[in-house]
Amino acid sequence: MGGDISRPAVANVHVLSDFRLRVEFDNGETRIFDAKPLLQGPWLGMLKNFGFFDCAFPNGRTVEWLEGQTIEPDVLYDESVAIAED
């Protein structure tokens, strides 16, 4: 089966300003993901409408939007920045 490393699943997501997501993972980590670089092309580009972007929700593994757009779990985790909890 190779060396697949399982990423934590998304437990909750909060939309922040400037197309960023505050993502809470099931391992207790909270990370900030900047989605702006991904909002290109006809499919993910639809999310440039902040009213649509604001409808992000956890789908059990990653973040999803109403039309079915998702961010690959590896990208969401690896390209996000951990934040310190109080």
Residue ranges and their predicted role:
Residues 1-86:
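Motif-centric detector for short Cys/His coordination patterns
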